[in-house]
C-alpha cells in the first residue's frame, strides 16, 4: 500500500490545504494529514481544535486519516506510519525555496523518503493561514477561502475573544 503524510500546523486549514490533500489522496492509497507544531508560529487554535477541525474537513474521505504528532520530526512520523512520501503544497517560488530546503534536511535524515510537491490552483495561490487569521482579526469575511467547518470555527473563536475583551 502506498502511503504518504501531509504535515502542517494547519492553523487554520485553508482551501489551498484542502486542495492539496484531495490531490494527494488521489495519488496515494493512504494519506495521513498530520497536525504538527511549528515553533516559530503563534497559534489561534490549540492542537485539539486543529485536529478536530481537520477531521471535520476530511471526514468523508475514506483514504485520509487525520492525526496529531506535535512533538515529533516529520521523518519520524513518516517512519512510524510506514509512509514513503511527504506531501507539501506550493503556492509560489517562496514556498518552493522553503520546501526545497526542508526536503534537503529530510533527505539527509532518510535518503529513501521522498518529498512530493503539489501546486495549488492559481486562484488559491495567495491564501495563507497567517493571512486568514489577520483578515478575521480585523473583521473580514474569509468564508470563500476556508472550508465551511473552519469558517464557522473562526467566527466562533473571534466572537469568544471579543466577549472576553468586554
UniProtKB/Swiss-Prot annotation:
Assembly and interaction partners: Homohexamer.
Signal sequence coordinates: none
Subcellular location: Cytoplasm
Homology family: Belongs to the bacterial CoaD family.
Database matches in Gene3D superfamilies: HUPs
The name this protein goes by in its record: Phosphopantetheine adenylyltransferase
A Gene Ontology cellular-component term: cytoplasm
Substrates-to-products reaction catalysed: (R)-4'-phosphopantetheine + ATP + H(+) = 3'-dephospho-CoA + diphosphate
Binding site for substrate: 9, 41, 74, 88
Pathway noted in the entry: Cofactor biosynthesis; coenzyme A biosynthesis; CoA from (R)-pantothenate: step 4/5
Recorded name of the encoding gene: coaD
Keywords: ATP-binding, Coenzyme A biosynthesis, Cytoplasm, Magnesium, Nucleotide-binding, Nucleotidyltransferase, Transferase
Site (Transition state stabilizer): 17
